[in-house]
């Protein structure tokens, strides 16, 4: 699986398998700040999810009992549930925009959907997110592919 970014926080993932009905596009919106050595508070408009390779782990939220796909790469200090070092992050969960409540998941998040719309707050928001999360989980179940690469177009 790949998420290809064209702009700082928007990406898209193309999945293709007969078990999910052929080719499906998942649109993503990542948290728009990226801390680095020059800007410790983050750069607004640059994703907090670093480009690179990640593993996906399907985990149950202890708060709402729903299952979410989480990105994990401990070499990038993105751990699943526990932080080893103070600057570690917990995994990034794929969640739906429509019913998203940051208090119902642990860790960080990537909003996803099978389409998108312009939000009056000034960004394109993924919509039909529950469908997107279901497609991601079905794709992983059908293929066994639990790896994801995030890169720039």
Predicted regions and their residues:
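Cell wall/extracellular polymer interaction/catalysis modules
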Residues: 1-127, 131-146, 153
């Amino acid at each position: 699986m790949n998420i290809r970014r064209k702009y700082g926080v928007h990406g898209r993932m193309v999945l293709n398998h007969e078990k999910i009905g052929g080719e499906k596009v998942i649109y993503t919106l990542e948290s728009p700040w990226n801390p680095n050595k020059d800007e410790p508070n983050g750069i607004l408009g640059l994703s907090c999810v670093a480009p690179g390779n990640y593993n996906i782990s399907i985990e149950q939220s202890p708060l709402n009992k729903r299952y979410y796909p989480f990105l994990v790469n401990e070499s990038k200090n993105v751990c699943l549930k526990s932080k080893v070092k103070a600057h570690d992050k917990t995994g990034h969960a794929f969640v739906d925009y429509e019913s998203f409540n940051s208090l119902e998941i642990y860790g960080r998040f990537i909003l996803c959907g099978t389409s998108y719309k312009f939000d009056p707050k000034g960004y394109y928001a993924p919509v039909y997110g529950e469908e997107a999360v279901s497609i991601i989980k079905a794709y992983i179940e059908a293929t066994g592919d639990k790896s994801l690469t995030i890169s720039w177009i």
